[in-house]
Amino acid sequence: IRGGKIHVHVIGNSSGKISPKGICGSGIVDLIAELFLEGWIDIRGKFSPEKTNLIQKREGQLCIEYAPGLYFYQKDIDEFILTKAAAHIMVEIMLRESGLELNQADRFYVAGSFGKYVSVESAITIGMYPDMEREKMINAGNSSLEGAQKLLLNKELLADIDQILEEMTYIQFAEVDDFLEQMVAAQALPHTDYKKYPTVMEKLKKRQNICFY
């Protein structure tokens, strides 16, 4: 969002002649992050229609026209916030079960095609990723496919896999005592405990002149 307008990029549109037809997963992360930083949605992810005329009411609910004829609805934001909250608490619970603080983690690996294209800054802004040193965040790409290829070429890696399996800890998140409490806390943008996200608070201060104490 620049100058009160939403600027979009179409994947593979090097000529600039292709109009957007919809929004992808990484685009949703960017959109929600920008809406939040601009103050067009609040900490709960709810639209603030008084902030811009791009927010309007259609089909009985608020939405924003992010491209000509394309709308992102309040229910879309609500549903995605549940997804990002789940991602956040999985990291928190894994760290807790490992007996580690976030600053003790050497690396944060993001695997899969979604992780390959999502903006790290946007994911941190909405609280989907932890707010940590950016150089520690590693895009692992399609690690499952790469691992399968390596195993096909070198069967000796089976011994490494067996060792990893022995060292792994299985966590049933639904059985964690404070899972629901953690889930509710993580549904705020970026989190109910904003001290977990100091760099996001700094961005808000610069974009909206908001101070947190």
Show the residue positions of the predicted features:
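Helical "lid/coupling" subdomains associated with nucleotide-phosphate turnover
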Residues: I1-Y213
